[in-house]
Amino acid sequence: MKKFYNRQKELKALQTVSEQIVETKGQLSVMVGRRRVGKTRLLNEAFHQENTKFLYLFISRKSERSLVAEFAEIINSELGVKFFQPQSLRDIIEFLLDYTKQKPLTIIIDEFQDIDIVNPALFSDIQNLWDANKRDSMMHLVPFPFNSDRLSY
């Protein structure tokens, strides 16, 4: 494995947000940077080091149905949720927002910019769900790469 250098400040910032999520409620961390500079590695290092409960979801250019099945399997496996059978990505986001009303969780969504390709309405759905639930949720949401013009904070 390649060595990981000079990212202590960034690691600490990410870890601090996740550690404080119980008190601060819903938090959004925006990760931006050129391709191949180590964004995914930074996130993995940050949350593996602290043993923070987190989900890593990769938005590949598949059908929404395929992603729903893939993400449901990850959620079932990582969170120990039984009988979770969502029909849409919106269902998954709604479930995770409800889940984080009881338990803190960091959710990393890689290749977030491709969400429009999977379902053009989903970005607005996520924004509406986030705005309605962030004050009651202990979710640390980390979408990346990210076009910051698209989401209100």
Please identify what each model-predicted range represents:
Residues 1-153:
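Phosphate-binding site recognition
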